[in-house]
Curated annotation (Swiss-Prot):
The chain crosses the membrane at residues 4-24, 41-61, 162-182, 193-213. It is found in: Cell inner membrane. The keyword Protease applies. It comes from Alcanivorax borkumensis (strain ATCC 700651 / DSM 11573 / NCIMB 13689 / SK2). Its main location: membrane. It holds the Pfam family Peptidase_M48. One of its GO terms (biological process) is proteolysis. It is a multi-pass membrane protein. Its cofactor is Zn(2+). Its EC number is 3.4.24.-. GO terms for molecular function: metalloendopeptidase activity; zinc ion binding. Belongs to the peptidase M48B family. This is Protease HtpX.
């Protein structure tokens, strides 16, 4: 379960860089119709094209970026019994979920963790940490793998991309409308074209709106963790899934060696209260355990 910080940062970076580039090329001035008013239809189309482009880029590079940043060693041919068991277990679970077997890898981290990523359910990657393989019982590892297979089978990355595309579109569109209104107010002489203030306002507003809108993406991320827990319980065993989450809770103080860009993709604990809870990609482990015990979320 490990996906979103890198994803959100990539999207935000694409939006800002694209905004600067298009402003330099004069696209914003064209959309402003020489100062006579914004063409909202053209602006909305423009926003959707570039909003979904950023989301698509993030989706397409998610697997190679995850491999690189987490130093994942993919297993093509098993070199020992543990690797053979890992491949066989992922194959069994993916067959049960009705998807093509993902690539399987191990990454060097003391903390028990795992993640799944990829641009579609039949071209995914499932990776586990050395710590997970060392300290978890086989039944618990299997439950964690089932959780990750659940993410893949549920198409979480594609759904996340669609949500992010809509959010990006809103950010690009709203930032330009705000920029145009403020720029028009500041330049009451009625001169044609856009002033320098417009470009500054657009960039700053995109960053602010982008951060605020990320709470929507994170809310979906928290919801999909509950669904993946249910998938783990169905593909493996509910008691083993609960046991795995309880062990993760017990290891909360183990140093996290996973790259910051991938922390949101892992089986990490969420924040329960305060402003940080809005930006947490995962629900608190206590809530996830309770949901499984009460058989909520399916």
């Amino acid at each position: 379960m490990m996906r979103i910080a890198l994803y959100l940062l990539t999207n935000l970076a694409v939006i800002v860089v694209a905004s600067i580039t298009l402003s330099l090329l004069g696209v914003d001035s064209y959309l402003a119709q020489n100062g006579s008013g914004l063409n909202l239809t053209s602006l909305l189309i423009f926003s959707a094209v570039f909003g979904f482009a950023g989301s698509l880029i993030s989706l397409l590079i998610s697997k190679p970026m995850a491999k690189w940043s987490a130093k994942v060693q993919t297993i093509n041919e098993p070199s020992n019994q543990a690797e053979r068991w890992l491949l066989d277990t992922v194959k069994e679970l993916s067959d049960k979920a009705g998807i093509k077997m993902p690539e399987v890898g191990v990454f060097p981290a003391q903390q028990s963790n795992a993640f799944a990523t990829g641009w579609n359910k039949n071209d995914a990657l499932v990776a586990v940490s050395q710590g997970l393989l060392t300290r978890f019982r086989p039944e618990e590892v299997r439950a964690v793998l089932a959780h990750e297979i659940g993410h893949v089978a549920n198409g979480d990355m594609v759904t996340l991309s669609l949500i992010q595309g809509v959010v990006n579109t809103f950010v690009i569109f709203a930032a330009r409308v705000v920029g145009y209104v403020i720029d028009s107010f500041m330049r009451r002489d009625g001169g044609g074209g856009l002033g320098f203030g417009y470009y500054i306002v657009v960039i700053v507003t995109e960053i602010i709106f982008g951060i605020a809108a990320s709470t929507i993406v994170m809310k979906f991320s928290r919801f999909r963790e509950y669904r993946a827990d249910v998938a783990g319980a169905q593909l493996a065993d509910r008691r083993d899934m609960i046991s795995a989450l309880q062990r993760l809770k017990a290891e909360a103080k183990v140093p996290n060696q996973m790259p910051d860009s991938l922390v949101a993709f892992g089986i990490n604990s969420g924040v329960k209260q305060g402003l940080k809870a809005l930006f947490s990609s995962h629900p608190p482990l206590d809530d996830r355990i309770a949901a499984l015990q009460e058989k909520r979320h399916g």
